[in-house]
């Protein structure tokens, strides 16, 4: 039995042999990837995972690969840029694992890190490449990897390895990294990840409006109506002319019948740009929905005077006149009703000319106008048209 035990390989001896072999490889300045494989092979055995020397050799082997690729890139030699960035991220990951072991107290409770200072100083020089990698992968539309690199960049701030650098307070690029994380998560249609770094991303003031858009979309996907609207209102208050926030606020208020709120939004937008045909038309529609037909018609006429080729102001004015006519008594106010229909007619006929494919909109209105004006030929034509649409 004793002889058998002596013949069996000793785990510690095998470990020392592979560590020694890896050191020899690294000294030769060649085959760093082989040295890395030796160390990752040792770490498959859970008994080796507390040995910081293994992690130190692993770190050195990745560092050597990183430096070799970096030198080729510097010399403008053909090299896989994505591989270089992956080596960067792996270097940080290994260093952080090593640091967690390095900071463990000894048997007397003393903490005396052996590697932290040198590794942290070295990695701080490489850290910008984590953010460069993020931007690189965004441009490649590889948003999953872009997100991972932006997180790796920001994560340094919470890692004890970099505690002495106070990254949370002095790193001015942290909001930029948070923005790219938010954007990448948005492009992956992951609402939870989109919102994860929102507070930090909002500190990148050059991209605040975009961040708020991504936040709004995330909250919409999460069906959180109150926070969705809160985000839309915040974005609109910052920039009333932004093409994202205005139409969505208007759509929401219109769908919920809150015309007063919709009017408030469009009036605020007009304060920012009083000549916008979009905002003027939106206001005419709100006024129509509120039953303020004369104001709707006046505003539609203003829009037509600005641009007589826009179809929708004609429709708003024509239907406003129609609704005014419908409020009149068909017997006691017959003459007045006919006059209103006569006013509605040119608007709706012009709308038909400008939007011939919108038959379901102008067809029923012209049907009622021609009927009440006793315009037999025109009425018959519209009547036949509507029958084909049924």
Q: In which residue ranges do the predicted regions lie?
A:
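Conserved structural position within tetratricopeptide repeats
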Residues: 43-44, 155, 200-203, 233-238, ...
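Structural register within alpha-helical repeat arrays
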Residues: 21-22, 58, 62-65, 126, ...
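Short coil turns that delineate tetratricopeptide repeat
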Residues: 46-49, 158, 205-206, 240-241, ...
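Single-residue signature of alpha-solenoid repeat helices
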Residues: 35, 88-91, 146, 194, ...
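Terminal, low-structured helical/coil segments at or just beyond the last alpha-helical repeat
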Residues: 235, 323, 338-390
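Post-signal peptide N-terminal segment of secreted/secretory-pathway proteins
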Residues: 26-142
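Short coil/turn linking the two alpha-helices of tandem helical-hairpin repeats
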Residues: 29, 64-74, 139-141, 161, ...
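TPR alpha-solenoid repeat register
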Residues: 54, 162-166, 177, 210-212, ...
């Amino acid at each position: 039995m004793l002889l058998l035990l002596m013949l069996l390989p000793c785990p510690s001896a095998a470990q020392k042999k592979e560590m020694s072999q890896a050191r020899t490889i690294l000294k030769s300045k060649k085959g760093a990837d082989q040295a890395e494989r030796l160390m990752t092979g040792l770490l498959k055995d859970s008994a080796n995972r507390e040995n910081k020397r293994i992690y130190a050799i692993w770190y050195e082997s990745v560092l050597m690969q990183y430096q070799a690729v970096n030198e080729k890139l510097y010399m403008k030699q053909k090299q896989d840029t994505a591989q270089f960035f992956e080596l960067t991220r792996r270097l940080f990951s290994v260093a952080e694992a090593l640091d967690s072991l390095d900071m463990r107290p000894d048997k007397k409770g003393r903490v005396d890190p052996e590697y932290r200072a040198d590794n942290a100083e070295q990695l701080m020089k490489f850290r910008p490449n984590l953010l460069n990698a993020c931007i690189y992968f965004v441009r490649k539309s590889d948003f999953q990897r872009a997100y991972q690199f932006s997180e790796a960049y920001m994560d340094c701030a919470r890692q004890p390895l970099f505690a002495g650098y106070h990254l949370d307070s002095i790193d001015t690029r942290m909001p930029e990294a948070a923005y790219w994380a938010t954007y990448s998560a948005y492009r992956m249609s992951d609402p939870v990840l989109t919102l994860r770094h929102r507070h930090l991303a909002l500190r990148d003031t050059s991209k605040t409006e975009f961040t708020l858009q991504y936040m709004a979309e995330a909250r919409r996907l999460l069906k959180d109506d109150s926070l969705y609207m809160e985000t839309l209102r915040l974005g609109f208050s910052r920039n009333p002319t932004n093409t994202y926030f205005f139409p969505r606020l208007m759509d929401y208020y219109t769908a919920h019948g809150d015309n007063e709120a919709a009017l408030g939004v469009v009036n605020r937008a007009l304060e920012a740009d009083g000549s916008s045909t979009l905002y003027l038309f939106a206001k005419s529609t709100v006024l129509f929905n509120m039953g303020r037909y004369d104001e709707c018609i006046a505003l539609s006429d203003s829009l037509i005077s600005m641009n007589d080729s826009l179809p929708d102001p004609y429709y708003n004015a024509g239907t406003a006149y129609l609704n005014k006519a419908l409020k009149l008594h068909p017997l006691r106010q017959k003459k007045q009703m006919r006059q209103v229909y006569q006013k509605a007619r040119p608007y709706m006929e012009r709308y038909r000319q400008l939007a011939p494919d919108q038959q379901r909109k102008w067809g029923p209105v012209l049907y009622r106008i021609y009927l009440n004006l006793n315009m037999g030929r025109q009425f018959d034509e519209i009547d036949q048209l509507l029958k084909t649409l049924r």
